[in-house]
């Protein structure tokens, strides 16, 4: 959204939590698409900050609408295979990760290295563009960028090259090798990152015991999974106030209001949690519950 602001391009957004399931999502998307002015749709799966995951049926709907209305789907897979309720850790074996790429050619998949590999070097990611979309020609691109108007070439050479800083060769080779080793079954990054789910479960238990609630608690008809992020609320306290008050107890977070959410609460992250901090968190949240008990009154 920050890039869109700089470029002067408009956007609209909605909180998908109230429109889950293929039928409800169809109604909402068709309402948003009715004006014919949507060029692309973007989402993260699993979702940041709620950690909800779109189902195969929902992704099929998005893909079919992308083809029907000719918009591009930007599928952010930064947390690739990190829905630990299903074992996606076996390369070239079922179950396969749900993706919109099965249902349309109008897709760009985005894969980051920083989450699945915890890569400590320069930030690097992949854009995986369908062959059909990559080779598609647009007169508008040719006119604006003075090239042949081939979508993939314009995106890489005329756009991404200009608005990103690039990445060192060593980082590119390192990322490529980690991807190769993952496909060969040498690196099991799903098992390596499962620690986030274990941390989330322990952290949630502490927060819930001290009066907090999970803001985004359901994934259609099942309990939301444990992973890198989760959402928290505390009675009637606003998300902004909760973020500030938690800081006074040594807990960092961001308000859901900064993420596009329309609900009150904060996003908690498991990345920096350590075993010796669970008793500390428990002790401090017990004090938090006592100090702000009035917000839990009905």
Each PLM stretch: what is its role?
Residues 103, 242-298:
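PLP-dependent enzyme catalytic core of the Aspartate aminotransferase-like
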Residues 98, 102-194:
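Conserved core segment of the aminotransferase class I/II
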Residues 168-172, 176, 189-208, 214-233:
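Conserved glycine-rich beta-strand-loop-beta hairpin in the small C-terminal domain of fold type I
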Residues 1-11:
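Substrate-binding/gating loop at the entrance of the active-site cleft, primarily
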Residues 18-94:
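Active-site phosphate-binding strand-loop segment of PLP-dependent enzymes
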Residues 13, 73-75, 175, 255:
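Hydrophobic residues in well-ordered beta-strands that form the structural core
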Residues 128, 231-233, 269-271:
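Short hydrophobic/aromatic beta-strand micro-patches
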Residues 9, 68-72, 104-105:
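A short helix->loop->beta-strand "cap" motif at the edges of active sites that frequently abuts
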């Amino acid at each position: 959204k920050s890039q869109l602001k700089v470029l002067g391009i408009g956007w609209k957004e909605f909180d998908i939590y109230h429109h889950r399931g293929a039928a409800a999502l169809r109604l909402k998307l068709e309402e948003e698409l009715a004006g014919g002015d949507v060029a692309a749709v973007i989402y993260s799966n699993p979702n940041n900050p709620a950690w909800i995951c779109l189902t195969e049926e929902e992704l099929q709907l998005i893909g079919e609408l992308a083809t029907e209305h000719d918009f591009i789907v930007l599928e952010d897979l930064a947390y690739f295979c990190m829905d630990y309720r299903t074992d996606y850790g076996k390369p070239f074996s079922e179950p396969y990760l749900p993706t919109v790429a099965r249902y349309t050619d109008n897709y760009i998949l985005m894969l980051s290295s920083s989450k699945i590999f915890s890569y400590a070097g320069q930030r690097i990611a992949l854009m995986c563009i369908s062959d059909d979309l990559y080779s598609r020609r647009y007169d508008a691109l040719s006119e604006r960028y003075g090239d042949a108007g081939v979508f993939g070439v314009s995106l890489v050479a005329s756009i991404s090259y200009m608005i990103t800083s690039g990445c060192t060769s060593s980082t590119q080779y390192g990322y490529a090798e980690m991807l190769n080793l993952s496909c060969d079954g040498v690196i099991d990054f799903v098992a390596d990152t499962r620690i986030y789910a274990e941390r989330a479960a322990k952290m949630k238990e502490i927060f819930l015991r001290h009066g907090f609630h999970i803001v985004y608690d359901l994934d259609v008809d099942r309990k939301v999974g444990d992973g890198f992020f989760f959402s928290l609320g505390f009675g009637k306290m606003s998300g902004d106030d909760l973020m500030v008050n938690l800081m006074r107890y040594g807990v960092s977070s961001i308000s859901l209001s900064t993420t596009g959410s329309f609900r009150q609460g904060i996003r908690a992250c498991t990345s920096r949690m350590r075993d010796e901090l669970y008793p500390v968190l428990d002790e401090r949240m017990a004090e938090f519950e006592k100090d702000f008990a009035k917000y839990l009154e009905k």
